[in-house]
Amino acid sequence: MIRALTGYATRSPWKVIALWAVLGIALALLGQALVFRATQASSGAFLPADYDSAAALRVAERHFGARPDANPSTVLVARADGEPLTAADERHVDAEAAKLARRPVVMPRPEDALPFARDHSQRPVVEPVVTAPDRGFRLLSVELTGNPTDPGMQNLYRAFREQARAAFAEAGLRTGFTGGLADTVDSADAGKTRSTVVGIVMLVVILLLHVLVFRSFLAALLPLLAVSVIGGAAAGAVVGSALLAGIDLDPSTPQLINVVLVGIGIDYFLFLLFRFREQLRDRPEQSGRAAAAAVAGRVGTAITSAALTIVAAFSTLGVATFGQFRVLGPAIAVAVLVMLVGSLTLMPAILAVAGRRMFWPSRGLKDRPREGVAARMGDRVARRPLTVVVASVALLGALAAGLVGMRMDYGQSGGDGERTAAAATAAEIAGALPAGVSDPTGVFVTATDGGTLTAERLGGLAEALTAVDGVGQVAPTVLSEDRTAARIDVFPTADPRRQEARDLVSGPVRDAVAAHRPAGTEVHVGGTAAVFADISKAVDKDLRVVFPVAAALITLILLVLLRSLLAPAVLMISVGLGFAATLGASALVFQHALGRSGVDFTLPLVLFLFVVALGTDYNILIGDRIREEMERPGPARAAVARAVRHTAPAIATAGLVLAASFGSLAVGPGSATQQIGFATALGILLSAFVLSIALVPALAALLGWSIWWPLPPRRAAGPAEPAPAPAERGSGSTEPRVRVG
């Protein structure tokens, strides 16, 4: 199957290139047009139906007209001269709020409308909420409907913001905006320029790495071009699959997929390029098309194994209960499978067309490069494996020490969001009112005895909630039209996005609800703090299930690939150390050094899957090469030295490219994105340079042939291959010879 695909691609390269060009452009355009219809920004929507906050959301939708795609924001209106609001000012604020509610906000504007652009035009829901006790400001609630991550929806909010500012400024009033869309848009604006610069820098770094390694402009540009085409097709396939299957993606998934595809796609092209150059060097009489066919057939199996390892790792997310995790698995799997098909077709086709011109103007096809760091590293690992093992474990252990005292952060604070105008407005509100006034915790009561609800019937529950330590205020009870449901808004003194508010809701508030629930009723607690309190429970449950299932599945794959019981154990232990070190380092940086409330709740699972899957890829490459070298005559340690010498350049280059790709996320606008980017980049670097180039070969040198127990490699007869003497180290190859099957 693999050789059939690569064979056709190298026999008919122009057909394959044309097909991918059309397919990539079409699917990329489709994905960009529909991506925001396939994403769900509400984290609560990903909770299983049996969680308390999810039940509260259903009551809010059924009895109080709440909409799942509604985006509430808060507008602060105050006098521009800093004086307290007068009664006339309050009347004017309320009158302008009514006018804003009647005035439609148009987006896109008629002059800016593009074909297939989605119309976000709507009338906002604007209502007065409360005046500060010192009359320093009055708050309005604003509700706009749509996906807050959609640029069109963000432009709609910007248009409303300008309308509101202009309307109140005419009367000498200033405005501030916070919560919901205000937070999202301000954070996006704060990080927009930086994200663009970082993206450009990432591409430049990848290009420079390729130029330095291959001394060729084509070898630098063509991989990026190929990966961009395949990545566009993959993104469109993911969005299309999500829409057809009726599942919602998390807004961060498309961005994460793009980074993953750039990283692994260039990695796969690198594996082909290294072997292609080696093939052309060793057989100068062979045509470029024939060399491409031979290389793609051999390396294609290694690429397939690497891709299927990632797919298998992320497929374990199917057992997760939290929907954000459960949909991430299929999305990554579909994207990686598309990249795999492209790696077996488009990439070999490009090699076949480019031939020896791929490495112009480099003289690398004629001159053998001098052995450098890789050869010295291989010799050092072979001569002093115990020292290398101790040093590697000490480094990983020191980083893993950061796990002590690590906490999970289930909020949405941090990053640029804490330095925006929305954050400043929230701080101003919190100085005069409970922090939860703009994002209350809702207690929803439904009658189950066939009767109706009254404020008097719920008076005991409201009093109990008022008495809870940490509750700043309890709003009057609101009844549904048919009086079968009621809502009691609770305003915590802590920011609903903070751990204190989540602890309050999951503990004292729910305890008070359970103890004072009126007979014949059912009570659920909802709101931001309640949602993230429930997410914490779901994530804790999923981590206990997904971790062992993923580890077992990857171990099974290694058993099949390496044909050994001991080698997979060695590789998985090393990868486990790498994961612990990476997560510990992330806690040291974000929680302890930067003072964040903890590491993002998605980080351990996403990091585990990426570090284990991608780290296993590199370990497969070095492990397979060690086995190949041990089949030759000579000492086991000499075989390890040769394996490191030949494979380290490919692993190092691939690791740097992948780390640069993920590292671009580390300076993104969101705290969660920053943490995933930093941690994954660090984990990949540790996997490449500490695990695959140092620790695993050193362990293999210590264990010798017994590492392949119970099926040691069949050693060829003949004299031992001598290790290169120092004076001779100028004629050996540094190429990674990936042996497969």
Place the predicted regions along the sequence by residue:
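Short, conserved active-site loops that position catalytic residues or coordinate cofactors/metal ions
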Residues: F36-Q40, N71-V77
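N-terminal extramembrane/targeting module of integral membrane proteins
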Residues: V75, R79-G82, R383, G397, ...
